[in-house]
Every structure is written in structure tokens, then in C-alpha cells.
Amino acid sequence: KTAPEVVEAMLPYFTEYYGNPSSVYSFAAQNKEVITQQREIIANALGAKTEEIYFTAGGSESDNWALKATAEAYGNKGKHIITTKIEHHAILHSAEYLEKRGYEVTYLDVDEYGVVKLDDLKAAIRPDTILISVMFANNEIGTIQPIKEIGEIAHEHGILFHTDAVQAFGQVPINVDECHIDMLSASGHKLNGPKGIGFLYIRKGVKIRSFVHGGAQERKRRAGTENVPGIVGIGTATERAIRTMQERTKKETEVRDYLIKRVLYEIPYTRLNGQDRKSVV
């Protein structure tokens, strides 16, 4: 659920501070500054630049934007995309959408632990591959993918790399430079923030096009009046998640390991679906 301190931070922006951040009057300028502050919090959490964070309505929009707009922008270079069979439907359905429009998509299998096989990834790369999209951590079994290695492979071949980090952001440390990530999707409600708010990290220099057209918000890349309460919510939730990450991880890992051990020991014919170590709790 939404953490009490997140709700408390959001409340004034429903009533007291209700100015439109895109307007020119002083009442609006205050909210514009608040949005910049939240953008900085998220950027710092990822080791990114402030101007590389774009607010959206959630993880699904971010995933759709990353795949569809990248395909459109780089379609003259190639029409081949690589992803996996265990992605969130926001990725899988976006991939299907692109297939119907002339793009080819390779769906990689995973091993018994839910991990992408790097040799399979390398074998799937073609001269016309423009994008690799692999989720950071699986939303069903929690398996964390070898993101850094995948990013290295992508960049060695001049391919853009996107990761759906909805299940991982705020749960495990992420540095976009160290992991060679070009685009990253995240959502507020997965880190005790509000629903209906997320963001897409887009590395500077990636020629991704606008997905929602209209106004000039989000540096002309995502139109629509900014959801100020939601943005304050995801910023506060991010700050809280980073601050408490070490303590939460220790406690939750102990509970997880205890549960797995008891179930495997006491219930016949059970097996663990996923990994017991490299996974989000």
C-alpha cells in the first residue's frame, strides 16, 4: 500500500498547491520546481542525469513508449527486436503490435531458474537488430537477470538496451551507466508509492520519439498536464525506498529464506520455481 509519509507528502498538492506547472504565473512556478526536485531524486537513485527522467502514467506506458517509439525512430536502421518469453504483457503485447506492422521479434527462452541464456542472446543478434528489451526482475518468480552482461552485449553490437525495472527499482541498487542501460521503466506503486505514476529513463542521445502528443510537457516528449501529486508521491517513495533498502532487504531475505526452507523440508514433492539468491524479495 502507499506509505503514510508518501500520502502526507502528496496531500497538499491536491488542494493547497494546485497550480498548473506548465503555466507562467508564480503559483505554477512553485509546482514546476517541485517536479524538478522529484526528478533529481529519481535520477540520483539511478546514477542518471535529471533531464533523462520522463514522468509517465505508469510502467505499462513506459514500456509501450520504449518499444514502439524506439522502433519507429530506428526503423530505418533495422526492424528486428529481441526480448524474452517471460516479459510483462506491456512488453509482449507491444512486441506483438510491432510484429503486425512489419517488425520481427525474437522471444528468448530462459533456463530452469528463469534466467536468460547469454549465448542464446548473442546468437539471436542480427545486423538489423535495433533493440533488446529484458526485464530486470521477473514479476512472478523474482529472478534477477544478468542485466550488466546483457547491456554489455547490446552495446558491443551497437544495439539499444531497455529494461523493465518495475519490480526492481527501489528494491535493489541500479546504476544505469554500470549496467549499460539506455532506457528503463519503473512504476510508483511497486515501491509503496501511488498508482498511476511512473517514469521512463531515456539516456541522453537516444533518438526516441514522442508517444503522447499535444503540449510541450516533459521536454516536448510526453504531452499532458503533469500529475503533480503523483510525481511528488513517486519521488517521496523513491527517497524512502533508497533510505530503507538495506534494512528491508535484510529482514525480507531472512523471512523468504525461512519460508522456502520450511516448505521444501516439510511438504513432499515441492520445488522452488526460480532462484533462491539472485531474486528480488
Predicted segments, located by residue:
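Pyridoxal 5′-phosphate
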Residues: 1-281
